[in-house]
């Protein structure tokens, strides 16, 4: 009974408002570790900027008047303005000690001074020939000099006049043994002034055949013609361009027609009896056009004298 009463008494005293409340130890506030506790670089304190009083921001900001803004003076192109803008270069400083190790100036170099010496016009130092460069062969004194353009012009005009002479189709038709119209298929150069021409002729292009030897080749006929040029012109006469169409009138080669023995050795059986033969400007070789074809066809219906 005594223990129970003592326990109730203690309980009443503990819940009484007059009883002093036990002071509880509050935890220490959270703080950053000190520099002594954490190693490392120390944080620099931020500078404190002076703040303006709030009265300065009370009113609205006044924008400057553009009309009162001063305009920049126009740039002057005079020499005085450029001299004022560009400051003169500063005077060179004292020469350093390391400059003594530099190369000597160009005036002190004897090699450059020798190269700058005045040379007479046209004089050139003879340099040794390059070992891999072929030397130009010296022209003998007896060889003729090349013709100048003024001397070569009359010869060129005479060659062009002889090749482009307009021959009469009726006279050429009567003086020739064959007349064909064909496309140049191949031109074989046998030597100087010798060409073997192969023409592809359609049936309508055989104006005059006589004993001309032709070889069928599909829709066309192959005709071989030996063109001889005895002129000294740089351009062959007559001229045959592969792929072009020509009207050709000339003679027919046969065994009774004599040819130089040197020419026969070059041909070596490539020219057969019955092939065509034309000699320079004496034969008719012209580019095909409708007017010339009409005149040649008109000559086929006339009687030659």
Curated annotation (Swiss-Prot):
Region named Disordered: 18-160
Domain of life: Eukaryota
SUPFAM superfamilies documented for this protein: TIMP-like (SSF50242)
Regions of compositional bias (Basic and acidic residues) in chain numbering: 21-39
PROSITE patterns: NTR (PS50189)
Residue ranges of domain NTR in the record: 159-304
Coiled coil: none
Signal peptide extent: 1-22
S-S bridge residues: 159-233, 163-237, 174-304
Keywords linked to the UniProt accession: Disulfide bond, Signal
Family stated for the protein in its record: Belongs to the UPF0450 family.
Protein name as catalogued: UPF0450 protein C17orf58 homolog
Origin species: Mus musculus
